[in-house]
Amino acid sequence: MKLPGKIAIMGGGSWATAIAKIVLAQADSINWYMRRDDRIEEFKRLGHNPAYLTSVRFDIKNINFSSDINKVVKESDTLIFVTPSPYLKSHLKKLKTKIKDKFIVTAIKGIVPDENLIVSDYFHQVYGVPEENIAVIAGPCHAEEVALERLSYLTIGCKDIDKAKIFARQLAGHYIKTSVSPDVAGIEYASVLKYIYAIAAGICSGLKYGDNFQAVLISNAIQEMNRFLNTVHPVERSIDDSAYLGDLLVTSYSNFSRNRVFGTMIGKGYSVKSAQIEMEMIAEGYYGTKCIKELNKHLHVNMPIVDAVYNILYERISPMIEIKLLTDSFR
């Protein structure tokens, strides 16, 4: 296996576009899989993604676009998957080329629905990719700030630390700092949880709770995250590292956070469906909430914030009532 070898971006959204920008700062060229031919043609004509991060310009001659996932996989050594988790299986259904000899990087911040597996486990169990050939990318890092080249930090998780370091060097640049970690599962679960807590923060904002309460909410959220991670994947970790606490903070507080925006709309009285229609973007935390709730039926971790968000989104309990109950459980 060449590492990183020829890199492919698998997805066409804002995070995929940001990662392509980061990779192309070091790589001479990339392969780029996008599902829609019309989007590819527009990209080539305009010199930028026509739908996401439109301010980011690309030198098109350095990008080999294709809507054929098998062609892209065959011609690449490292595959960076950057699609919303609910759509991953539909993309992979078209895949006839084996990927177990590729280096798989997941920048997907979610759990595969129906399977209730984090993405690294899904690639390992379903596609036979060795665990040491799977890496994850974690923040704190908003795509919009990558577009602006604001200083950002990425953590690369891989059970093979040497491979993590090689790939991390491929991403490092003047505005991207990188670190590595062997805690693949912990980083992935933390990425799912941060979206749920960002929705909670948004709901509270929509209900006009102030900064004082938001601080208490996030303090309790990091404790809840720590309890869950220590139960589902008990390894030594520092929960205050940027891949855990840092990513949680930026996702919960930033105006770029679509999950916080989604939560704010729910807090203001929008239904789930109307909020999703108005946003026109995927709020991963909506799907992640149900997945974590299902997982926790077997783990029995005390997770009052996740429970509250689930009750609001799926049981249609009034946000005002549910958050009031939550406030009574905090200290």
Regions found by a protein language model. Name each.
Residues 1-56, 63-67:
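NAD(P)+-binding Rossmann beta1-loop-alpha1 motif at the extreme N-terminus of oxidoreductases
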Residues 4-6, 102, 152:
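Nucleotide donor/acceptor-binding cores
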Residues 56-65, 129-133, 174-176, 301:
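A short helix-to-beta-strand connector/capping loop
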Residues 66-74, 78-149, 167-169:
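Rossmann-like NAD(P)(H) cofactor-binding subdomain of soluble oxidoreductases
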Residues 74-75, 193, 245:
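Alpha-helix C-terminal capping/helix-to-coil transition sites in glycosyltransferase folds
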Residues 87, 98, 126-133, 151-238:
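Internal alpha-helical scaffold of NAD(P)-dependent oxidoreductase catalytic cores
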Residues 201-205, 230-331:
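NAD(P)-dependent Rossmann-like dehydrogenase/reductase catalytic/cofactor-binding core
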